[in-house]
Amino acid sequence: MNVEQVKSIDEAMGLAIEHSYQVKGTTYPKPPVGAVIVDPNGRIVGAGGTEPAGGDHAEVVALRRAGGLAAGAIVVVTMEPCNHYGKTPPCVNALIEARVGTVVYAVADPNGIAGGGAGRLSAAGLQVRSGVLAEQVAAGPLREWLHKQRTGLPHVTWKYATSIDGRSAAADGSSQWISSEAARLDLHRRRAIADAILVGTGTVLADDPALTARLADGSLAPQQPLRVVVGKRDIPPEARVLNDEARTMMIRTHEPMEVLRALSDRTDVLLEGGPTLAGAFLRAGAINRILAYVAPILLGGPVTAVDDVGVSNITNALRWQFDSVEKVGPDLLLSLVAR
């Protein structure tokens, strides 16, 4: 990201969104916020993203990098600056003390304790503008965090790989690999920014997955998600999911909402279980997003990506809408959200 000057507030917010994505997965339990500081001539004088827990928020990181050039400048940030004391002082204090001229943000802070920053800034004489690229931010880097704030439960993304005829394995049960290497690398990148990976005991017993996030060279990513195994069956002590490469939690239930309550301290959960677990979560309305890696192969046979979802006729079909479609190597990645 070597942009030195912007021509519009929207362009500056686009850069702030990039900074937000850059820190996603490293800021838990704080939201992954990005900030850019622009002087009156459109020159970027400071930028940054939220630091890990205990570190500074994005606005303060950007102010630190801007130094005295922040005076009279425009601060563009993906979320309303906070107005409370936590492990760090309120961001509004730093903005007022830096004598910035204007603060532009995308989405309001829904936290009743931390919110109210916009009003505080206005009262101090700063110009404040809200809602810039709000939909892009809310559906992008802050999607999972905002869901957690609204519901108190983690955001669940069901990820699966399938052939173009909807099969998750061949008739003999083999599935390595349906998706391409490029798709698998993309998945590992997503694992590295998730808080937890969720599978059932059936997947562990059948496939013995490690459920780790890895880099392109095969080494472990610096940050590993919590591995969560759901079900009442025992798994062998030598199972790879129990190795010391990451932490593992066992949740002995078949009820999706019990699982989510047990993970209520998490924000972003990847459901990678097989058709039984996926079906249970879909029936419970516990999936917020679907990521389907579709490979250009035909398998036929009985092994579908999902079991019964409680639909007996076409009228009662579970209807989703496409969020995005992109090419990942030879595969397609379909992203869908609930209507």
Swiss-Prot record:
Q: What is this protein called?
A: Riboflavin biosynthesis protein RibD
Q: Which residues bind Zn(2+)?
A: 57, 82, 91
UniProt similarity note:
In the N-terminal section; belongs to the cytidine and deoxycytidylate deaminase family.
Q: Where is the CMP/dCMP-type deaminase domain?
A: 7-129
Q: Which GO terms describe its molecular function?
A: 5-amino-6-(5-phosphoribosylamino)uracil reductase activity; diaminohydroxyphosphoribosylaminopyrimidine deaminase activity; zinc ion binding
Q: Which organism is it from?
A: Mycobacterium tuberculosis (strain ATCC 25618 / H37Rv)
Question: What are the EC numbers?
Answer: 3.5.4.26, 1.1.1.193
Q: Which amino acids does the record list as binding NADP(+)? A: 161, 168-171, 177, 203, 207, 274-280
